[in-house]
Amino acid sequence: YYLNYPILFDYLSQAEKPVVWTLHDCWAFTGHCSHFATANCYRWKSGCFTCPLKGIYPRSIGLDRSRENYADKRYYFNKVKNLTIVTVSQWLNQLVQQSMLRYDNLICIPNGIDLNCFRPIDHIDPKYDFAGKKVLLGVGTKWTREKGYDDFVELAKHIDDDYRIVLLGLNVNRVNRLPDKIIAVHRTENMDVLVQLYNRALVLLTLSHNDTYPTTNLESLACGTPVITYPTGGSPEAIDETTGCVVEAGNFNALIEAIRTIDRNGKAHYSAHCRARAEKLFDKDLQFAKYGELYKQITDPAHNAAVKITD
């Protein structure tokens, strides 16, 4: 967001080298925002102005330059002749096709994860027993309303006492104001802790209102834990009917019923399907190989004629 892109794209257009640009959000084709869903704003399709999200990250203080930013991006980002755009979800891929980015070379390569790290385990540390309650897990790095914090607080008012919401990544201010049925686990860089929590959970809840393709969904599935998600961005692409479900954003009756359905069926009903889906679709080595094939295509004309990348 803070790159001097006019200088960069001037250079790339003059260098005449193959370029691969991986998009993780919508910033490249809007006049300001990285996600537009919460504002229900589609001005990016024709030209941004009077941005309703200029106070949201990446925050703009003072003047609204969304009109100028949009024009600048349209000019500079379309200058590179030999550019391939990669999106991490089909949802984002479809948005790019509707945007001012005019490139035919557009493919989807999803995020990948380390399946040796994120895996089912037999032993859970007793400190994550949580008094034997059934764990509804939420994982985040910066908990905001857009990332679903308010939804978890509201959900806590409606769940039965045999459930507990466990939120990973809360800051101190949030921790001090939590309802009784929410347990905080401080942010950690220790992957073992994350794997323990995924395995301990009955289900991962992805209640974000803005997202592109949450890696947490993939990590949870790899650990054998099903996912319930809102229909946000590309989040539903990670699951199918054997590994979780999609519920309407903010519909807590539907969310609670989905939780109860998974609970009635039992986590074991889903675990093997979750792991199998992760092994088939989300192995990081699989995604690395797709990038490798892409690089061969754009640098080797003979290889380009013989091999085609598939999404």
Language-model regions, residue ranges each:
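Carbohydrate-associated surface elements
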Residues: 91, 112
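Conserved donor-binding/catalytic core segment of Leloir-type glycosyltransferases
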Residues: 128-147, 153-157
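Short alpha-helical donor nucleotide-sugar binding micro-motif in glycosyltransferases
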Residues: 196-201
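Short hydrophobic beta-strand element within catalytic cores of glycosyltransferases
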Residues: 226-229
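Conserved acidic donor-binding segment of nucleotide-sugar-dependent glycosyltransferases
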Residues: 241, 245-252, 261-267
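Aromatic "clamp/platform" in nucleotide-sugar-dependent glycosyltransferases that forms part
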Residues: 209
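Acidic anion/phosphate-binding donor-loop and adjacent secondary structure
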Residues: 97, 113-127, 176-177
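Nucleotide-activated donor-binding/catalytic signature segment of Leloir-type glycosyltransferases, i.e.
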Residues: 169-195
